[in-house]
């Protein structure tokens, strides 16, 4: 019997709206779910000991990753309320963008992010450049898709108007 976090990850995939499933089926090469952290999964051993882009830890401590059109989700504990939804958020951000731009690079999301920026609690989401915006996109998607909307309000320092605008964006675009 697989551990509960693996079962939850698979259940999350099954529960996604059809529009998201179609985008992922068209845009991704693979989704890997298994035991351990990222370096233990899908021939990702080369990431063992390598620092994360944030520089705060290494990939060994990480329960999920997205890159090269692959979602990888393991059983390691994670601060993310839902690792699978977070990685799906990154994947959608990538595959739903246009050309070399991710969806979070679009003018529409960029404007939404700028509106939310003064309310963001986490320095991780306020990082300059692409990283903060992409992580906010993935975390916001994860909070909404996993039915943990209060987590989105908390990310935005209790600003419900900004949280509602973010929820509306994801509802219109992805049906969540």
Per-segment meaning from a language model:
Residues 1-176:
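Active-site-flanking segments in enzyme catalytic domains
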């Amino acid at each position: 019997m697989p551990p509960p976090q693996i079962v939850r990850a698979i259940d999350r995939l099954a529960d996604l709206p059809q529009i998201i499933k179609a985008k992922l089926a068209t845009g991704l090469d693979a989704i890997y779910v298994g035991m351990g952290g990222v370096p233990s999964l899908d021939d990702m051993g080369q990431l063992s000991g390598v620092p994360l882009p944030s520089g705060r830890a290494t990939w060994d401590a990480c329960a999920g990753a997205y890159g090269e059109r692959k979602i990888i989700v393991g059983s390691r504990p994670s601060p993310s309320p839902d690792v699978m939804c977070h990685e799906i958020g990154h994947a959608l951000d990538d595959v739903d963008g246009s050309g070399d731009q991710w969806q979070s690079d679009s003018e529409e999301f960029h404007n939404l992010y700028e509106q939310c920026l003064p309310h963001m609690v986490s320095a991780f989401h306020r990082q300059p450049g692409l990283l903060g915006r992409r992580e906010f996109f993935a975390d916001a998607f994860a909070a909404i898709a996993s039915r943990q909307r209060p987590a989105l309000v908390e990310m935005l320092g209790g600003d419900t108007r900004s949280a509602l605008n973010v929820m509306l964006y994801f509802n219109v675009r992805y049906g969540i």
